[in-house]
UniProtKB/Swiss-Prot annotation:
Biased composition (Polar residues): 170-183
Coiled-coil blocks: 15-47, 177-199
Region spans: Interaction with VPS4B: 183-199
Subunit structure: Probable peripherally associated component of the endosomal sorting required for transport complex III (ESCRT-III). ESCRT-III components are thought to multimerize to form a flat lattice on the perimeter membrane of the endosome. Several assembly forms of ESCRT-III may exist that interact and act sequentially. Interacts with CHMP1A. Interacts with VTA1; the interaction probably involves the open conformation of CHMP1B. Interacts with CHMP2A. Interacts with VPS4A; the interaction is direct. Interacts with VPS4B; the interaction is direct.
A biological process from GO: regulation of mitotic spindle assembly
Motif (MIT-interacting motif): 186-196
Pfam family, one: Snf7
Entry-linked PANTHER family: CHARGED MULTIVESICULAR BODY PROTEIN
Protein name: Charged multivesicular body protein 1B2
Length: 199
């Protein structure tokens, strides 16, 4: 196993660890919510408020861990592509060397700064890999197509028997279906234009 592969393993491990921390925070949030109910039942509003603050703090922490886990995971996928293509630059290798201790610390600020460095390295790599990504499915990009996210959210809401529009901020209701429809319309228009060009 090369050094770069070891670092790649560490990145993937860190993403899982961050994910585990998010789940731990979720569990803590649920425990705090149970304590809120008990305190309210006893008529102790002040204690309930403290547990509510704790629950919100745990929820926010879980979101932060999840967000960072996804970011580290995306960078790991980009490193994997770079390793596969043999496009690991010296500056990228330098950033990778400094990461092991940072990832072990589970300090979100330090990890975020490290991910910033990585993403900067990948901006230059992106230009080189664009042709390859055009021929492959772009599963390694850092961003996810919004319409796919919206469709999955709608699908999950339907499965759970929930109305997704209730969760959307005002003014955005119905945007899920509309964005999917407009994307499909764009794709159809492009296909039609290509067919006309061929004739």
């Amino acid at each position: 196993m090369s050094n770069m592969e070891k670092h790649l393993f560490n990145l993937k491990f860190a993403a899982k660890e961050l994910n585990r921390n998010a789940k731990k925070c979720d569990k803590e949030e649920k425990a705090e919510k149970a304590k809120i109910k008990k305190a309210i039942q006893k008529g102790n509003t002040e204690v309930a408020r403290i547990h509510a603050e704790n629950a919100i703090r745990q929820k926010n922490q879980a979101i932060n861990f999840l967000r960072m886990s996804a970011r580290v995971d995306a960078v790991a996928a980009r490193v994997q592509t770079a390793v596969t293509m043999g496009k690991v630059t010296k500056s990228m290798a330098g950033v990778v060397k400094s990461m092991d201790a940072t990832l072990r610390s589970m300090n979100l600020e330090k990890i975020s700064a490290l991910m910033d460095k990585f993403e900067h390295q990948f901006e230059t790599l992106d230009v080189q890999t664009q042709q390859m990504e055009d021929t492959m499915s772009s599963t390694t990009t850092l961003t996810t197509p919004q319409n796919q996210v919206d469709m999955l959210l709608q699908e999950m809401a339907d499965e759970a028997g929930l109305d997704l529009n209730m969760e959307l901020p005002q003014g955005q209701t119905g945007s899920v279906g509309a964005s999917v429809a407009s994307t499909e319309q764009d794709e159809l228009s492009q296909r039609l234009a290509r067919l006309r060009d061929q004739v």
